Structures are given as C-alpha cells and as structure tokens.
A protein has these predicted regions:
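Acidic, low-complexity, intrinsically disordered interaction modules
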Residues: 23-54
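Negatively charged, low-complexity tracts enriched in Asp/Glu with abundant Ser/Thr
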Residues: 1-21, 48-62, 66-75
Length: 75
C-alpha cells in the first residue's frame, strides 16, 4: 500500500493501532493492515467473516477489534 493511500485509510479510521486501521461498518468492522494493504472484515460477534490476510494477521485483526471495541464504538 502506498504511503499516501495508507494515510488516507488511517485518517478515515475510527481507530489506528499497531499499524492496523479499524473502521466501523454498521455493527461490523473493517480492519486494514496499513503496511501490506491486506484487509479483514470482522462481524459484530467478533468472528472473522472475510479476509485476504494470513492466519497470524487475521488473529491480530480480530484481537484488535475484540479488545478495543469500547473505544471504536465510542468514536
């Protein structure tokens, strides 16, 4: 992902943490790795719905959403 695009994604995000940008989509969440550009869609239940991330990145994305949900929802 280009630096310019990563900056745009980060600016639009509700939360940026450890290189991952999280954006609410209704009750669900979009998570983008700002370095690789890979993304995940995490359901309101905390379960992973779709991703092009590897297993480790997917786990990180889910953990970020689940552990920081109160900050994302308050945004």
């Amino acid at each position: 992902m280009s630096e310019e695009k990563a900056s745009e994604v980060a600016e639009a995000a509700d939360l940026v943490l450890n290189g991952y940008a999280v954006t609410r989509d209704g009750e669900n969440f979009r998570v983008v790795n700002l370095y690789s550009g890979k993304a995940a869609y995490v359901m309101a239940s905390g379960e992973l719905s779709e991703t092009n991330m590897d297993e480790v990145e997917s786990e990180i994305a889910c953990r970020i959403v689940n552990e920081n949900r109160r900050y994302i929802v308050a945004a």
